[in-house]
Amino acid sequence: MVNATHITEEVRFESEEEIKDRYTEVNFESEKVKGAGVPVISTGRTAYVDDSEASTFVVGASGSGKTRKVLMPYTLSCIRKNENLVIHDPKGEINRYMYRELEKEGYEVIVLDYRRPLRGDRYNPLEYPSKLYKKGNTSRA
């Protein structure tokens, strides 16, 4: 159930000053940052990000800049904050642009390419339980 008691008749976009007060500033050129999250506004070198636990749903037509304007800055802020990442990247764009940066920062990059399985890494979800079973540890397998 939604609690709508905080909603007023006035609905508007936040001003730049309000955004700067509310969100965390991230400088992509520094090695470490205070926050990681989805960019609300960005100049390219810096951004104000929503580092709350809120979910984000990004919608846009093909070629509208979802990857370049939202996902790339989000990924970079997570790298700078040393966050763990699982990235769904069906076209391989983020992998293509961020792979070297991730490795440079010490990330282990695993690529599961379901379109071309021989090209990427492989993952067998039954491998670990199979090893446990073969060792006689059937209760954990």
Task: Indicate residue ranges for each PLM-predicted region.
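Switch/coupling segment of Walker-type NTPase motor domains
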Residues: 27-141
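Charged, amphipathic alpha-helical linker segments immediately N-terminal to NTP-binding catalytic cores
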Residues: 1-34
